[in-house]
Amino acid sequence: MARVKRGVTSHAKHKKVLKAAKGYYGRRKNTIRIAKQAVEKGLQYAYRDRKNKKRTFRALWIQRLNAAVREHGLTYSRFINALAKSGIEVDRKALSELAIHEPAAFAAVVEKAKSALPKAA
């Protein structure tokens, strides 16, 4: 059986890691042992933050909606409750975009939702 030398394989692996570490600071970009750790940690952060991104954007949409709805005399929580009662099934992202780019349409949605709320005494 022929002898297997791993020079080509390990060189390719090292190249792959160093390519991923491109742009890192200090020895993290050119020392394989340190670069490997840095790339691994970077991938962990990327995985974690793909999940966090969803939370962050939802929070942003809610903040925007809260600000937009308060201009119409409601709070965010009462607005969402009113939407549910009036049977309007539009997600927070779409409502947020509507509030920014189509204020008139958003105002109509708010008025429709307000009509589902009980009148204050």
From Swiss-Prot:
Pfam families: Ribosomal_L20. The keyword Ribonucleoprotein applies. Keywords: Ribonucleoprotein, Ribosomal protein, RNA-binding, rRNA-binding. Signal peptide: none annotated. One of its GO terms (biological process) is translation. GO terms for cellular component: ribonucleoprotein complex; ribosome. PROSITE patterns: RIBOSOMAL_L20. Belongs to the bacterial ribosomal protein bL20 family. Binds directly to 23S ribosomal RNA and is necessary for the in vitro assembly process of the 50S ribosomal subunit. It is not involved in the protein synthesizing functions of that subunit. This is Large ribosomal subunit protein bL20.
